[in-house]
């Protein structure tokens, strides 16, 4: 009897949206994460679920009963946890050593809050750098969810055939990536990367997701038509899409991963309207999208798909395809046909990147010169795990060598180092302050007459405010 084709649904959760007031985080936990987990529990569905460590931490603080439900589903095997950086930072835009630390911190958070350490990894915004497979492997991951659209656009043949090029400013390609599917639909040499696990040269297993499937499902969840089409995406269209992919799986592989998108679209509108229509509408209630997500799962199973998870498809697919072609993916690209530099070039990134970099370098040098202290470890963790505003506050309160220099003033009201949200320094969906290497100083530690480090004073001077 032939095996059923497998299908992976992986909502990915990130509570640190820049336009989400921290006071509303519990609301998101209750109106998005809770109904998703209850749907899985009550329907006996199997899915993967990715969340940043900070998202899990907020769940524990703001909605512990929602976290308890997640923990129960993870431990019972209904949900496979998928790990990522502790905060939703684009790894392609920061130094590898910082990325490695935050990846391990994210894994620690999953283990702390659910009792399970993920084997599969997620790369925020699918921002690409060639060192990422080594980074994830060193952090302890066995597999990584990859962006197929970036991979396919690295083939000149596909770029020429589709006429697509990377958008260096935003997500304008998101609704046009179906052109990739139109080109590869009868080409098994390309399809096989979407329907089989593959392995990076270092042995890291990879599974690929694509907007050609995720985008129609997203529009279906939202039930939206605003200016893009006359009617919402229908259940029949979703069914036809899954039927087409079922025949492609039969010809080329064993599974597909059609939904690896924001979990917050289940139960809320999240960023849908600002991304698609540039409308200032954020996190509106969308309770009908919960029922539509259930319909996606039910449609898949009615067509003969088996709901599965990343680790299961890898375990059951046989030897992975050896895939050294990932080395031709251009550094700096991201999902939706965009680029990581679109995030790195935002106003807040350019403003705060040098501040973050100088603070990091100063603390790292102090660690080296003092032989390491717990307070310094805590300061580094604060900087790489929360945001520049909180990092400044934490470091300023440290005893000993990290006391605030007497001739450095405190930030005054109105300065744009905000403490309203812990996503201000490191933007969640799109990092506002990222270490892109724009600041360099051979010795970031400057000492005055008091022999106290002038790291923070120098940081403020660089912004023209000291």
Where are these regions (language model features)?
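A short acidic (Asp/Glu
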Residues: 19-21, 58-63, 93-95, 128-137, ...
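Acidic, His- and aromatic-enriched active-site or binding-groove loops in soluble protein domains
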Residues: 66-83, 104, 137-192, 287
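Active-site and substrate-binding clefts of carbohydrate-active enzymes
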Residues: 2-31, 166, 180-181, 194-212, ...
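CE4/NodB-like, metal-dependent polysaccharide N-deacetylase domain
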Residues: 98-125, 136, 245-251, 255-259
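The substrate-binding groove and active-site-proximal loops of carbohydrate-active enzymes
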Residues: 17-28, 52-60, 85-99, 117-124, ...
């Amino acid at each position: 009897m032939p095996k059923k084709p497998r299908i992976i649904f992986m909502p990915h959760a990130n509570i640190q949206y820049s336009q989400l007031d921290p006071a509303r985080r519990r609301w998101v936990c209750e109106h998005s994460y809770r109904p998703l987990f209850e749907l899985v529990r009550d329907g006996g569905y199997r899915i993967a679920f990715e969340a940043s460590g900070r998202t899990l931490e907020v769940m524990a603080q703001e909605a512990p009963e929602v976290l308890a439900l997640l923990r129960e589903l993870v431990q019972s095997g209904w949900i496979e946890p998928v790990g990522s950086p502790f905060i939703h930072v684009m790894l392609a835009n920061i130094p590898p050593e910082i990325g490695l630390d935050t990846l391990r911190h994210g894994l620690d958070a999953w283990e702390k809050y659910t009792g399970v350490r993920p084997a599969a990894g997620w790369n925020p915004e699918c921002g690409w750098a060639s060192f990422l497979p080594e980074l994830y492997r060193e952090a302890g991951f066995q597999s990584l969810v990859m962006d197929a659209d970036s991979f396919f656009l690295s083939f000149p043949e596909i770029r020429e055939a589709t006429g697509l090029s990377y958008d260096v400013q935003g997500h304008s390609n998101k609704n046009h990536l179906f052109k990739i599917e139109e080109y590869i639909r009868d080409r098994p040499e390309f399809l096989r990367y979407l329907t089989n696990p593959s392995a990076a040269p270092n042995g890291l297993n990879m599974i690929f997701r694509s907007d050609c499937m995720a985008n129609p499902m997203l529009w279906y969840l939202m039930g939206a038509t605003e200016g893009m089409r006359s009617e919402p995406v229908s259940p029949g269209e979703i069914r036809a899409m899954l039927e087409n992919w079922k025949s492609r799986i039969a010809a080329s592989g064993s599974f597909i991963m059609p939904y690896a998108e924001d979990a917050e679209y289940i139960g809320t509108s999240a960023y849908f309207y600002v991304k698609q229509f540039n409308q200032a509408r954020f996190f509106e209630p969308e309770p009908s999208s919960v029922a539509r997500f259930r319909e996606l799962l039910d449609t898949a199973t009615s067509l003969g798909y088996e709901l599965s998870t990343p680790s299961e498809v890898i375990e059951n697919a046989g030897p992975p395809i050896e895939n050294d072609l990932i080395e031709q993916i251009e550094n700096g690209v991201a999902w939706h046909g965009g680029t990581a530099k679109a995030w790195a070039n935002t106003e807040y990134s350019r403003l705060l990147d040098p501040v973050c970099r100088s603070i990091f370098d100063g603390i790292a040098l102090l660690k080296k010169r003092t032989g390491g202290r717990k307070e310094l470890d805590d300061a580094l963790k604060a900087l790489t795990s929360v945001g520049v505003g909180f990092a400044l506050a934490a470091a300023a309160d440290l005893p000993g060598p990290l006391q605030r220099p007497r001739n450095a003033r405190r930030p005054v009201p109105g300065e744009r180092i905000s403490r309203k949200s812990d996503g201000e320094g490191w933007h969640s969906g799109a990092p506002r302050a990222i270490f892109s290497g724009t600041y360099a100083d051979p010795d970031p530690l400057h000492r005055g007459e008091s022999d106290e480090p002038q790291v923070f004073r120098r940081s403020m001077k660089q912004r023209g405010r000291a």
